[in-house]
Amino acid sequence: MATTVTLKSFTGLRQSSTEQTNFVSHVPSSLSLPQRRTSLRVTAARATPKLSNRKLRVAVIGGGPAGGAAAETLAQGGIETILIERKMDNCKPCGGAIPLCMVGEFNLPLDIIDRRVTKMKMISPSNIAVDIGRTLKEHEYIGMVRREVLDAYLRERAEKSGATVINGLFLKMDHPENWDSPYTLHYTEYDGKTGATGTKKTMEVDAVIGADGANSRVAKSIDAGDYDYAIAFQERIRIPDEKMTYYEDLAEMYVGDDVSPDFYGWVFPKCDHVAVGTGTVTHKGDIKKFQLATRNRAKDKILGGKIIRVEAHPIPEHPRPRRLSKRVALVGDAAGYVTKCSGEGIYFAAKSGRMCAEAIVEGSQNGKKMIDEGDLRKYLEKWDKTYLPTYRVLDVLQKVFYRSNPAREAFVEMCNDEYVQKMTFDSYLYKRVAPGSPLEDIKLAVNTIGSLVRANALRREIEKLSV
């Protein structure tokens, strides 16, 4: 049923994620070309020659989950890897939720997970709270991490795998004149000796992975195009111990046009504090007003708290028009891989970084050959086939359920259904479409229609009162 697909896509994928643990080349040693004399075909005969006396050299710009995962995969696959990250202690206004499958797929140690959330409350505009974790099994949870901890761990792991990690700011790149000439990167390196100004340097590389976030300079350098973006605003609040006990394994999501006209507000638990935040695409200038409303909705539960950090950052709303150019590819937020409605981005960032790196490792035969755009395009094709439908469906979901407070009330009402919860959590936790029941799918469709009808009736009554 279309409704079920929409709900499954809210936090999940349309097919299972599989991981490759070994990097084995599948590129044949010789290429058989059609006997056609066209200038476009000639390049195939010279694409990806063997590299003499050196390994393929790849720069990863940005050291978040996408960059860290990409750098580790490249280094393990025999690629000479350089990772450039501007802020080694970067904190980001990110809820920090990761699905259970990410812990296993990326072999994350449990000590970097601050909280294991097993209970979630979805709170409607009229403050009706629905518990949406009732179907979780005993071993299942949503991991809560701090980005500065997760990012540092992934960078450290990449370095241990053989990547060179540079504390630096990427400035620009000079594109090669020839198809196999190097890219020249211009960057400022900070070594603790030159102060805040740093030292300007250059570097030549064979390929570039842009993992430098929503304001990606790598994206600008390949004319990747613009996209809609949300402003996320978050305050980290240290609350009294007795208040923190309430949030020990609980996260809250608030919907309503007071907290955001097109997103939601959240209270997510961290190690010794809570993260309270919201976001919006359409009313960025009002973000502080929405943040205040989010705090007010949760005020009784965070009473006595002290704000210890304030964070704001742009978050992309859909993939960029262009994510690849020759030997440059975008991943993570730089590519626009954040889902609407849920705002999930950490898993998709790390996954895209790994997938892009795997394509380079395979195409280069573990660093022995030059790569071309065709090798990187395999990453995009695989990504789009697996994940792009999720982004498209979530666009529709946001338009249907986030368009008005009555529609949000209907959405929260629908979330009270245990079948909806089971399908949603199975999809989110494991990034797969869980097998459903045809009978339950029919019931769900009927209930969804009923919720929307009631929402529209409520909207009409509100409009009458406002006349």
Swiss-Prot record:
Documented EC number(s): 1.3.1.83
Any one annotated GO CC term: chloroplast
Q: In which pathway does it act?
A: Porphyrin-containing compound metabolism; chlorophyll biosynthesis; Cofactor biosynthesis; tocopherol biosynthesis
Instruction: Enumerate the InterPro entries for this protein.
Output: BchP_ChlP_pln/prok (IPR010253), FAD-bd (IPR002938), FAD/NAD-bd_sf (IPR036188), Geranylgeranyl_Rdtase_fam (IPR011777), Geranylgeranyl_Rdtase_pln/cyn (IPR011774), Geranylgeranyl_reductase (IPR050407)
Feature: transit peptide:
1-43
Q: Which GO terms describe its biological process?
A: chlorophyll biosynthetic process; photosynthesis; vitamin E biosynthetic process
Localization per record = Plastid, Chloroplast membrane
Q: Which organism is it from?
A: Arabidopsis thaliana
Molecular function in Gene Ontology: FAD binding; geranylgeranyl diphosphate reductase activity; geranylgeranyl reductase activity
Taxonomic path: Eukaryota, Viridiplantae, Streptophyta, Embryophyta, Tracheophyta
Q: What name does this protein carry?
A: Geranylgeranyl diphosphate reductase, chloroplastic
What the record says about family reads:
Belongs to the geranylgeranyl reductase family. ChlP subfamily.
What the protein does?
A: Catalyzes the reduction of geranylgeranyl diphosphate to phytyl diphosphate, providing phytol for both tocopherol and chlorophyll synthesis.
